[in-house]
């Protein structure tokens, strides 16, 4: 007798990784999953429903969920049969990039409200049921910026560092209840949203920022960032494939990076526990040797660094 499908609740499915993951799980050939694909604004569900095709209403349902609202989370769980979630995928997130002096505290708080407290809110909601049943899997879409700081991404990186520390700590306790936590750590992901964001910040004023810092951001960081996305970036489909493997694993890993081409960029931090090697090298590459940085990024795009296909 086949096992009953596992209920998978995914946040942030209007586009990008969340959308691709929901569709891939819903089209699982063995029909192992019943996907609840959520988003804050149901007015944006059209792309997901089109991509889901015949799976819509069968192995995939769309629901409203604002991870920043206790009421919205409760309403969403009430719509799930039995209110029981077998796999929770914390994917909803927002970005923030730019010179620190030009960013408002309200914008910073919004990043933490969504990226960190939104994930915590969902976990608190599903954990009692998972503990009672002594089974469950919590997947967190983190980032390599949860492993290393990146210039002009201080607030976003801080939110991901918070997620990494929180869920690593929680993982120890939850093993006692046969509940697994997996932190999935993508590098740059090429989406329409990212392209628009880079264009918007390239002309933003960032009031309160000194001319030198603004010049560094526009003339050094933004070109390097575009080069990074072009040479090292993954598609949402590729990241989703890795997450599907993680969800289907008999013993899910605590951490899984999705892009081996990014590995050399985080190796410097591992090589020097003091952190000085990473900070000084990053500083020199961005501010003194930008041409060398661009050359290095192009080298990372060669086939020897391509992301492998993880075995089933």
From Swiss-Prot:
<keyword id="KW-0521">NADP</keyword>
<dbReference type="GO" id="GO:0007601">
    <property type="term" value="P:visual perception"/>
</dbReference>
<dbReference type="GO" id="GO:0005829">
    <property type="term" value="C:cytosol"/>
</dbReference>
<keyword id="KW-0472">Membrane</keyword>
<comment type="similarity">
    <text>Belongs to the short-chain dehydrogenases/reductases (SDR) family.</text>
</comment>
<dbReference type="GO" id="GO:0004745">
    <property type="term" value="F:all-trans-retinol dehydrogenase (NAD+) activity"/>
</dbReference>
<feature type="binding site">
    <location>
        <position position="143"/>
    </location>
    <ligand>
        <name>substrate</name>
    </ligand>
</feature>
<dbReference type="Pfam" id="PF00106">
    <property type="entry name" value="adh_short"/>
</dbReference>
<keyword id="KW-0560">Oxidoreductase</keyword>
<dbReference type="InterPro" id="IPR020904">
    <property type="entry name" value="Sc_DH/Rdtase_CS"/>
</dbReference>
<dbReference type="GO" id="GO:0006703">
    <property type="term" value="P:estrogen biosynthetic process"/>
</dbReference>
<dbReference type="InterPro" id="IPR011348">
    <property type="entry name" value="17beta_DH"/>
</dbReference>
<dbReference type="GO" id="GO:0042622">
    <property type="term" value="C:photoreceptor outer segment membrane"/>
</dbReference>
<dbReference type="GO" id="GO:0042572">
    <property type="term" value="P:retinol metabolic process"/>
</dbReference>
<keyword id="KW-1133">Transmembrane helix</keyword>
<keyword id="KW-0812">Transmembrane</keyword>
<feature type="active site" description="Proton acceptor">
    <location>
        <position position="156"/>
    </location>
</feature>
<feature type="binding site">
    <location>
        <begin position="9"/>
        <end position="18"/>
    </location>
    <ligand>
        <name>NADP(+)</name>
    </ligand>
</feature>
<keyword id="KW-0716">Sensory transduction</keyword>
<feature type="transmembrane region" description="Helical">
    <location>
        <begin position="87"/>
        <end position="107"/>
    </location>
</feature>
<dbReference type="GO" id="GO:0004303">
    <property type="term" value="F:estradiol 17-beta-dehydrogenase [NAD(P)+] activity"/>
</dbReference>
<protein>
    <recommendedName>
        <fullName>Retinol dehydrogenase 8</fullName>
        <ecNumber>1.1.1.300</ecNumber>
    </recommendedName>
</protein>
<keyword id="KW-0443">Lipid metabolism</keyword>
<comment type="function">
    <text>Retinol dehydrogenase with a clear preference for NADP. Converts all-trans-retinal to all-trans-retinol. May play a role in the regeneration of visual pigment at high light intensity.</text>
</comment>
<dbReference type="InterPro" id="IPR002347">
    <property type="entry name" value="SDR_fam"/>
</dbReference>
<dbReference type="GO" id="GO:0052650">
    <property type="term" value="F:all-trans-retinol dehydrogenase (NADP+) activity"/>
</dbReference>
<dbReference type="InterPro" id="IPR036291">
    <property type="entry name" value="NAD(P)-bd_dom_sf"/>
</dbReference>
<feature type="transmembrane region" description="Helical">
    <location>
        <begin position="170"/>
        <end position="190"/>
    </location>
</feature>
<feature type="transmembrane region" description="Helical">
    <location>
        <begin position="138"/>
        <end position="158"/>
    </location>
</feature>
<keyword id="KW-0844">Vision</keyword>
């Amino acid at each position: 007798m086949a096992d009953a499908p596992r209920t998978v609740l995914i946040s942030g499915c209007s586009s990008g990784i969340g959308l691709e993951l929901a569709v891939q799980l819903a089209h699982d050939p063995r029909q192992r999953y019943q996907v609840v694909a959520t988003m804050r604004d149901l007015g944006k569900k059209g792309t997901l429903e089109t991509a889901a095709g015949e799976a819509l209403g069968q192995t995939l349902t769309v629901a409203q969920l604002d991870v920043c609202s206790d009421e919205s989370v409760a309403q969403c769980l009430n719509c799930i049969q039995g209110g029981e979630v077998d796999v929770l995928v914390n994917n909803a997130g927002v970005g923030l990039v730019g010179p620190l002096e030009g960013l408002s505290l309200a914008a910073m708080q919004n990043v933490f409200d969504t990226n960190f407290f939104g994930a915590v809110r969902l976990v608190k909601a599903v954990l009692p049921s998972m503990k009672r049943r002594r089974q469950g899997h919590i997947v967190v879409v983190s980032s390599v910026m949860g492993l290393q700081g990146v210039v002009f991404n201080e607030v976003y990186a801080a939110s991901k560092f918070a997620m990494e520390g929180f869920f690593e700590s929680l993982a120890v306790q939850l093993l006692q209840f046969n509940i697994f936590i997996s932190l999935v750590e993508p590098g740059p992901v090429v989406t329409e949203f990212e392209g628009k964001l880079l264009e918007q910040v390239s002309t933003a004023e960032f009031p309160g920022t000194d001319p030198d810092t603004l010049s560094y951001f526009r003339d050094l960081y933004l070109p390097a960032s575009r080069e990074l996305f072009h040479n090292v970036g993954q598609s949402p489909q590729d990241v989703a494939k890795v997450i599907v493997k993680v969800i289907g694993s008999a013993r899910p890993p605590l951490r899984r990076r999705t892009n081996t081409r990014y590995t050399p960029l985080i190796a410097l931090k591992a090589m020097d526990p003091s952190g000085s090697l990473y900070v000084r090298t990053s500083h020199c590459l961005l501010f003194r040797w930008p041409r060398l940085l661009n050359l290095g990024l192009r080298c990372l795009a060669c086939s020897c660094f391509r992301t492998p296909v993880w075995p089933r």
